[in-house]
Amino acid sequence: MTDLKTWGQALDYTIKTRDEWQPHRKGSKPAITYATHFSNYNPQGRRFLIKDFNKAMMETYISELRVYRELADQTLNHCIQNIQTVLNHCIDMGVLAYQNNRHKWITGEGKFKFTKLRLTKQPRITLSPAQVDQFYAAAKNCFNQESLADTVMLSAWTGLGWAEFSQLTPSDIHLDAPVPFIAVGEREGFTLKTTHRKRRIYLPSGSDGYNKLMPILSRNLESCTDPEIQIFGDLFTSQDAHRVKFNDVRDYLQLDEKLTPYCLRHTFNTWLANLDVHPAKAHKMMGHASMKTTMEYYTHINDDQVIEAYSRLTAAA
């Protein structure tokens, strides 16, 4: 077999021939997913030339995944590792030549070795309920962006990110149920990041979530003429377009420039932690694959919250 030229060729070859990536092997699916991110999110896609891999290109790619796809550093390291795995597997199999080891991203053996990110605990940017209300009002009244305002309120009070709320159709919204709920991942064709993301978002009558979201959901359902149309996703051309409008309001309100739409999902989990919702319940409500991810929100409790918890202790506890 002649030397491979493009990323797509290398990826296909690795998926076909690498034993660790076969369907029966544990970890094969996420490894392929992380590697495939490069096909989806670099401008040339699968046609990207292997000869063009270098340090500067990888840093740009990872920066864009972090900023525009809002991936965590640990996830980004998985992406780096599995790009490297694809390229080095092809070298090991003799279908890709050893590389020029004068470059810093090439080992002495002529294989690829890209620098991974140093994992540091980043402070989470979150909003208070009052700030969410302020954001909603500014988006709706100052920018005439009611659709943006709706998604901000929805995300903050449900923990739904773009990938989930942009897929919602009328069939996912059950306002006439004894306890109204939003079904996430129950409908055929609803794409989930992991199976853990399949869940129901309940809106108990009289709760703040109910009072905030019922008018929004009812209004959007009434304006939906097609039961298969995406209630919120069709209001924006893309996730990037949604983010641009979000950033306009964020900057107008002089909020932290690191605040992104995905921070509203962090906001929801932080509210749960601040209200002492049991971690097991929060884990299910968020749809996290790992309890460790949920527990990270419970390690950012400040002294005032600890004091308030002590104040609730009684002899009847």
Predicted regions and their residues:
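Basic/aromatic-enriched alpha-helical hairpins
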Residues: 2-70
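N-terminal DNA-binding recognition helix of tyrosine site-specific recombinases/integrases
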Residues: 34-41, 69-111, 161-163
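DNA breakage-rejoining catalytic core of tyrosine-based enzymes
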Residues: 51, 113-137, 190-205, 225-226
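Basic, Lys/Arg- and aromatic-enriched nucleic-acid-binding interface segment
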Residues: 77, 81, 92, 105-162, ...
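Active-site/catalytic core of tyrosine-dependent DNA strand-transfer enzymes
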Residues: 132, 204-256
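Conserved tyrosine-mediated DNA breakage-rejoining catalytic core shared by Y-recombinases
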Residues: 167-212
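Short, polar N-cap/turn motifs at the start of nucleic acid-interacting alpha helices
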Residues: 173-179, 277-297
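Catalytic-site neighborhood detector that most strongly recognizes the C-terminal catalytic loop/helix
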Residues: 188, 286-311
